[in-house]
Amino acid sequence: MKYSLIANQLMRRILLLLLLFSLVATSGAAFPFSKRKKKTQSTQTEKKSAYERALTEQLTESVRGSFVSFHKTDGRILMELPKQSLGRDMIIGVTISSVSNPKMGDLGFKNSNLVHVRFIEKDSSVVMQVVNTDLFVPKNQPSATLAARLNYDNLDFFSFPIKAHNDSTGAVLFDASSFILKENRFFPVIAKNVGSYTVNSSLKDNLTRVTKLKVFDENACVGMDRHYIISLSGKKGSPITNYPVTIGVNFTLALLPNDLMTPRLSDTRVGMFLMNKDVLKKDGSIDKATFVKRWRLIPKDTAAYFAGELCEPTKPIVYYVENTFPPLWKRAIKAGVLWWNKAFERIGFKNVMQVADFPANDPNFDPDNFKYSCIRYLPTDVENAMGPSWTDPRTGEVINATVLVYNDVVNTINNWRFVQTAQIDPRARGAQMPDSIIEETLEYIIAHEIGHTLGFMHNMAASAALPTDSLRSPAFTQKYGTTASIMDYARFNYVAQPTDYGVKLTPPRLGVYDYYAIEWAYKLFPGSKGFEDDAKQLRLLADKHEGDPFYRYGLQQTGTKYDPSAIEEDLGDDPVKSSTYGMDNLRMILKNLDHWIGDEDGDNRKAELYNEVLSQAMHYVRNVSVNVPGIYLYQ
């Protein structure tokens, strides 16, 4: 799917004001001509500290936590860090939480790269450093050479004058408004380009409004509404000029773990999201490397795990499903998440993938809390779902994931199943698919997106692994489905002919490659002393399957398609034969379109499906034409 960024808890304000009044008693005069002493009054006010003055001079809303506190006062955001948080590794990320026009931003979109920061005290300022994570120092080599560290120094990115210290705790208080409330190129909310158009945007600072402040155990969230004026320009003109849009933005600040996960070196034969690193060797030299992005899985009983017993992880991967989903969708979503457990069981882990509803009666649960990975429902007309995640920039450890499911993804399901399977599946011969088709197809979509959150990229070679004629075999398709991996854009069995009774029409509940990818990414090895030892074992695993098309990884090609065996929306190892079968089926579907789609469904729906048939036909033509100048690329 496409991937393509964005409760108040009031705390008692600190107020200390004590007035002491002392009246000096005067004695009454004995005689009227006596000199009367004037009555005097002495007022003594306890002097406030700079910290107290900063938080009491204006009406202040505060949220306090163990690692950070925020105070909103007079249109400013004050940040308070205790001593133990200074110098700690943290990340900052941005999520779009609302938008006035869905065409101007994707609700739930996260910036793809977290910014790794530290706050340190320098003289009379707090400096936010952007940490240089290009250099990786292995655990068995804790001290890097001075020369190496000097070549990978941190960047002093923002400086905040200290307003005060908390005398009782030693915490430092500073004004972070210049960073949080202003536009920043490291945290772009508005994309610079949309298709062939250049986007120009200007933030109206005076209209920015803080909407929420939340602090949790190890992360915090600052929400705000930002107002932009947007213009689009391109070679064909300017379709949008000075268009106002309001975008809700959540800034997340979270602590990174003190103990680093053991990273895993990449292999071009397994498709995973990557990060580039310079690895410091014992002799002081630098090796170029790429680490994969994955969750940290540790068995509760390591001895039992290496003895071959199924073990639960110390920290399972749990997804919380928003309660606004229709009941049918929730069933499919939960099932799709759990598909991956079968693959984890093969490598010794059980109950890794878990799923639950948003807790209704748990006051501690909050979807804005970074520690919860959530599946969110977006009631917009976007026909899509996506699975972004955030990772520790030091090691590639996935630390938070979100699956976004847009309402109109069901339209895509209706169209796919009609043009690809109506020739053989009577259930698909209608304007709208029945619940059974919606449910089984949505399961696949969710499992695909969960695969992305587990670290897996698209594998566009997987569908070409299956022999075309085998896609007409009930026995073969019941075992293998339509593809070797659900991370392909393989879709549904358009090769199956109307008389191929018993043929499976859907992708498998995990393909051969998916089981292999889980093993490669998450299997643990006894006696391993680090990522280099793991890499030796993993190379042997990949070598074992070298040359087997079911285990082949094909990188998704953007722009020009060079490799005809690694393209989207195709099935089978013979594109000419597969497309010929597909064209035969489209003729049959087109012939029956008026019969299957009644007048009660409306002419618009009939016209829409007619266009979908034409679009599918063009897919078949393209799948063949790519072979003419094509070359096969092997990772």
Please name every model-derived segment.
Residues 331-338, 342, 444, 615:
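Solvent-exposed, polar/charged alpha-helical surfaces in well-ordered, non-transmembrane soluble domains
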Residues 463-635:
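Conserved catalytic/binding loops enriched for acidic/polar residues
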